[in-house]
Amino acid sequence: VCISINEVVCHGIPDDGKLLKDGDIVNIDVTVIKDDFHGDTSKMFIVGKPTILGERLCRITQESLYLALKMVKPGINLRAIGAAIQKYVEAEGFSVVREYCGHGIGRGFHEEPQVLHYDSPETNVVLKPGMTFTIEPMVNAGKKEIRSMKDGWTVKTKDRSLSAQYEHTIVVTDNGCEILTLRKDDAIPAII
């Protein structure tokens, strides 16, 4: 479990001594292994009364994930999905982190392909039924640049702006995808 608060982009280390305050945005990222297969998901939570920026950032990040999920089907290039996420996020005045991405997942936690959340000519993977991977855009309220902390694990926004992330593990079906990590409060069907 990673718990990332406010400007922590990813890999936040849980800390019993850290008190949350009104308006904090918190990402909880959970990985499970069941029957030798991995699953990976994350979700944002807002503590108490949300700030306008915090609520908007979380909403736009989740919407960018849903937009991407609705695009998944055989024959689609992952580049188109990354480009759509980037276009949507940047049109809202936010930025997409470049150093971290979604990933293939199965018996191994990080497998091919890499799933970039921005447009890159180096992405040339065409989706096929049975492919299983995560989509997990990390979106910053400020600039896209990040920095690693001295603990060698935690990553924060360089400009100390807020960061949000939503993630699902999916499998490509014959005509769309199935969300393997769907939550009861998700506003999207399990099978798209």
Indicate residue ranges for each PLM-predicted region.
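Active-site neighborhoods and metal-handling regions in enzymes and metal-associated proteins
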Residues: V1-I192
